[in-house]
């Protein structure tokens, strides 16, 4: 199937996680690992939602956005919920960047910015810190 890939995709380098030290019980905060177990009741709450996983959820996540907005004291339309930070970055780049509107970012930043820019053919202006 790779013969059908675009040149952009076929030259894409696979993600390589940051330095992986071989130390027992090491918690890699830079990889979003958490040293603590879920709060009490989380497993039961998750188990109670398993049946609904076969259905599409509310794509606007209106109830979740309203709850977050109320907690933060902002309007629900100021909240973006997505399937993780990578999806939200993708949505933001689609909304605000293109060939004529490059992404400006610091030289020391999240390593997925240049990958998304390459995939979406968005110029990236890197600002040294």
Language model segments and positions:
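Short glycine-rich anion-binding loops that position phosphate/pyrophosphate groups of nucleotides
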Residues: 32-35, 85-86, 110
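Conserved beta-strand segments of alpha/beta enzyme cores
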Residues: 25, 78, 123-125
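PLP-dependent aminotransferase-like
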Residues: 95-129
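N-terminal "arm"/small-domain region of PLP-dependent enzymes with the aminotransferase-like
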Residues: 1-55
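Phosphate-binding glycine-rich loop
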Residues: 61-102
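A general structural signal for well-ordered alpha-helical segments in protein cores
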Residues: 6, 39-43, 61-65, 89, ...
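Hydrophobic residues at beta-strand termini and immediately following loops
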Residues: 29, 56, 82, 127-128
């Amino acid at each position: 199937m790779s013969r059908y890939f675009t040149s952009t995709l076929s030259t894409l380098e696979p993600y390589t996680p940051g330095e992986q030290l071989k130390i027992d019980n090491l918690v890699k905060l830079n990889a979003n690992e958490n040293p603590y177990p879920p709060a009490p009741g989380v497993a039961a709450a998750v188990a109670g939602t398993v049946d609904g996983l076969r259905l599409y959820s509310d794509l606007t996540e209106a109830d979740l956005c309203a709850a977050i907005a109320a907690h933060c004291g902002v309007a629900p339309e100021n909240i973006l919920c997505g399937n993780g930070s990578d999806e939200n970055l993708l949505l933001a780049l689609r909304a605000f960047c293109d060939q004529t509107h490059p992404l400006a970012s610091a030289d020391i930043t999240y390593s997925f910015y240049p990958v998304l820019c390459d995939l979406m053919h968005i110029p990236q202006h890197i600002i040294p810190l």
